[in-house]
Amino acid sequence: MASVKLGSKDQRIINWLLEEDQPSVRYYTLVDILGRKENDPEVREAYSRIPRRGWAKDILKLQKPGGYWERREPSWRKDVLGWIEFLYRPKYVATNWRALVLSDLGLTSKDKRIRKIADLFFDYKLRLGSPFNFFTEEACIVGNTARMLTRFGYSDDYRVKKLYDRLLEDQREDGGWNCFRPDRGTLDNWEPLAAYAALPKQKRTRKIEQSIAKGAEFYLQRKLFEEGKSKYAPWFRFHYPTHYYYDILIGLDLMTKLGYAEDKRLRPALRILNDKRLTDGTWLLDRVHPDLGPGAGYDLDVKKVRRLALEEPGKPSKWITLTALRILKRVEAAS
């Protein structure tokens, strides 16, 4: 990986990201931005601290002994609706949503607490023959689960491979995916491409590579944000955790990670990314999902939803800034 050319402002931002309060951000900055190797002593030290300090520690300390958060496991193992409630509700603090964040932060099955999470999904969600399993679920759910379990270290498990098979089957003719319409894809359904991006390149089959190319073209044709008659305002705001919501930052991260950093059709979205950069070199966390801000166009009973926030919205964000710098580095390396 090419080294980053840093100006004085950039170096201040790097130093900020390297602070030890969030070892996950420090680890990814060392590896993805500064190009350090995994066997580098500082990299190894930062990685070892991820479950012991910062966001991951805060999430893990709330985990129940059985590996879950919030609701108890259904007493009857074939209680399908009970398992859905158990894994997914309340949004966005139940087991599924917290597990997705832990997978983003870099934790793997080397940690027994992560193995407990995976066991819950394997026990119910991926059981063949379940009346509500990966054969009947939406691509957003399948993609998120495949991404999470792949990052946890289960990409070789046959049950995870079945998830990828399902994503291949569910891709629309236009190259996209859609949880709600069978006739066409939508930019909102980015989770399958995120699952592909999590899969090491050497483990991608020819069919997956073809699906990536078709899916990437779907996004590039739309410049990552052109869908419908008018611009959808929340897509132009940056968020984390993302859950299953889309924005331009997600699109840029996926396209550059999947090898399309040189494509000229990214330029409008890259201009938006650069325009949103503050004078001090950072980027804001604009909103925490669900984003009900201007232009959202929908209402939600907030009593049924609990936001999962790692950082304060409206302020410079280490996670958003790290993601933006990753994108810009890939573009620079490809040029």
Predicted regions and their residues:
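Preference for long, amphipathic alpha-helical scaffolds in soluble/luminal domains
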Residues: 1-335
